Amino acid sequence: MTDKRKDGSGKLLYCSFCGKSQHEVRKLIAGPSVYICDECVDLCNDIIREEIKEVAPHRERSSLPTPHEIRRHLDDYVIGQEPAKKVLAVAVYNHYKRLRNGDTSNGIELGKSNILLIGPTGSGKTLLAETLARFLDVPFTMADATTLTEAGYVGEDVENIIQKLLQKCDYDVQKAQRGIVYIDEIDKISRKSDNPSITRDVSGEGVQQALLKLIEGTIAAVPPQGGRKHPQQEFLQVDTSKILFICGGAFAGLDKVIGQRINTGSGIGFGATVKGKSEKATEGELLRQAEPEDLIKFGLIPEFIGRLPVVATLSELSEDALIQILKEPKNALTKQYQALFNLEGVELEFRDEALTAIAKKAMARKTGARGLRSIVEGALLDTMYDLPSMESVEKVVVDESVIAGQSAPMLIYGQPEAQASGE
């Protein structure tokens, strides 16, 4: 190896690849009549790393996690919703078991089990789907059903969902075919009316019809790298029968539909069963009794419901559950903000009464867990704005009055005599 030295003849040495002289680089490595500099070595290493990344096949998990293992992992990130976790764990396990062993077992064709999640806003539907995909190490994408329209109309084509999934895995079709697709707001594409109309329902029943084949299983033709479709183009062929579809929605008003069905036939007169106010079922209890006929009455077409055989219901989160969500999961909101403050070298403390106040505020807003972040962000905004410009702050304390907007977080400085309250 030559390190910025001339060879025996006293000639100046140059890199055989980039042409730089030994004085322009840090190291020059000599071979038989050739030289390579440290910069070219680094560049070669980068090229090789990129090639390996592109060529290396996606490695599947050596063993499929059991329903118990899937459930335990969900427990680490999602508070409550135990019945839904159990249903999801079994459905996901059966889906990937079918993929690993082919679509048939001993000559028996195994059906596809897509999932329908019913639950109020902020109850954890999206989080459950995301956590599953992350745990199983499979591509995941989300779609909003309200943006979808039938092909040929202004809006998003249903096949764009598959294109998004392909983008998540660099257009690797094999990877995409093991992925999970979560379609949110599925209740918003319910049929607008029971009566046939002259005008076409392109964002309601029309979208349900368009999604049917995609969810059940078809070969979707997707243009490569997001190009527009044209006749001479070669398309990527994606088998959607191997993709797990999870559809979710709040289904506001479905509890009333279920209640009407349950109460129908209770009769009137002397033989009627009269229920007291205390016996009235809650919204969550009613949703757990959902039948296909209720979903049809709500506005989903029978064929669409048939493609979603696994139904899991999620309850509205209680105040206690929201407090748990704030502090217990691995990526709990309070832990996230504490990590953020730690980057400034400052400790962040949430008093218990502050957590209770945050939960009460979210309950009043009826936004579930989804509203927690905006409440915490609002309470800490001024502090996060001022903190990088301040010196000697060691600790920030958030109590109930901060959440109520009555005072600013308490700032504790390095010197005891310098305690002050942030403004």
From Swiss-Prot:
Gene3D superfamilies: 1.10.8.60, ClpX chaperone, C4-type zinc finger domain, P-loop containing nucleotide triphosphate hydrolases. ATP binds at residues 120-127. It comes from the Bacteria. GO terms for cellular component: HslUV protease complex. GO terms for molecular function: ATP binding; ATP hydrolysis activity; ATP-dependent protein folding chaperone; protein dimerization activity; unfolded protein binding; zinc ion binding. SUPFAM superfamilies: Glucocorticoid receptor-like (DNA-binding domain), P-loop containing nucleoside triphosphate hydrolases. One of its GO terms (biological process) is cell division. Zn(2+) binds at residues 15, 18, 37, 40. Pfam families: AAA_2 (PF07724), ClpB_D2-small (PF10431), zf-C4_ClpX (PF06689). Residues 2-56 form the ClpX-type ZB domain. Keywords: ATP-binding, Chaperone, Metal-binding, Nucleotide-binding, Zinc. Component of the ClpX-ClpP complex. Forms a hexameric ring that, in the presence of ATP, binds to fourteen ClpP subunits assembled into a disk-like structure with a central cavity, resembling the structure of eukaryotic proteasomes. Belongs to the ClpX chaperone family. ATP-dependent specificity component of the Clp protease. It directs the protease to specific substrates. Can perform chaperone functions in the absence of ClpP. This is ATP-dependent Clp protease ATP-binding subunit ClpX. It comes from Yersinia enterocolitica serotype O:8 / biotype 1B (strain NCTC 13174 / 8081). The lineage of its organism: Bacteria, Pseudomonadati, Pseudomonadota, Gammaproteobacteria, Enterobacterales. The gene is clpX.
